[in-house]
Amino acid sequence: MAQMYFYYSAMNAGKSTTLLQSAFNYQERGMNPLIFTAAIDDRFGVGKVSSRIGLEAEAHLFHADTDLLHVIATLHEAEPRHCILMDECQFLSKEQVYQLTEVVDKLDIPVLCYGLRTDFLGELFEGSKYLLSWADKLIELKTICHCGRKANMVIRTDEHGNAISEGDQVAIGGNDKYVSVCRQHYKEALGR
């Protein structure tokens, strides 16, 4: 029986690398994975999942209004799929997370979701909130703070490297804008 998995972490913990390894494992066994990523995240090019260590794969895009159940069912009917791999899942809507539960429950296809748990203010993203609520399995991927402790928070920085404590929830960026830190250093950076 298929299940939905949510692999979550702060930035730079290897979520995309883990997704790409999963895709390779399925392909190595002659199976056909289907990869999606958020259209909003074009840091490494449109329609690609890329990792910091240089791995990449082509991916279908999801937008805020994409009906994932319909798209996946249509692609699965044309060519059977053995798993769905979703990158940047923090950008999913509540409805899209529900659609992914339908892929698992009605199409019996495993769905592996990868994304950030919280934003730079320590607040849950909508997609992450519902994945934490509805996924069958939750797997935390770990990275480390500069002090050596587990990093579970993300700081957004300005062009001078100073921590920012206000702004839009979504601002696409990588190491140029975000730093993963432990809770203690998060609070210190924001003066809390």
From Swiss-Prot:
Q: Which Pfam families does this entry report, sorted A to Z?
A: TK
Superkingdom field = Bacteria
- The record's active-site residues are 88 (proton acceptor)
Q: Which InterPro entries match?
A: P-loop_NTPase, Thymidine_kinase, Thymidine_kinase_CS
Any Gene Ontology CC annotation: cytosol
Provide this UniProt record's keywords sorted from A to Z. Answer: ATP-binding, Cytoplasm, DNA synthesis, Kinase, Metal-binding, Nucleotide-binding, Transferase, Zinc
Q: Which PROSITE patterns match?
A: TK_CELLULAR_TYPE
Which reaction is catalysed here? Answer: thymidine + ATP = dTMP + ADP + H(+)
Q: Identify which top EC class this enzyme belongs to.
A: transferase
For molecular function, the Gene Ontology terms on record are:
ATP binding; thymidine kinase activity; zinc ion binding
What is its subcellular localisation? Cytoplasm
Q: Which Enzyme Commission numbers does its entry carry? A: 2.7.1.21
Q: Name one GO biological process term.
A: DNA biosynthetic process
Q: Which NCBIfam families match?
A: PRK04296.1-5
Report the protein name in the record: Thymidine kinase
Q: Which organism is it from?
A: Vibrio cholerae serotype O1 (strain ATCC 39315 / El Tor Inaba N16961)
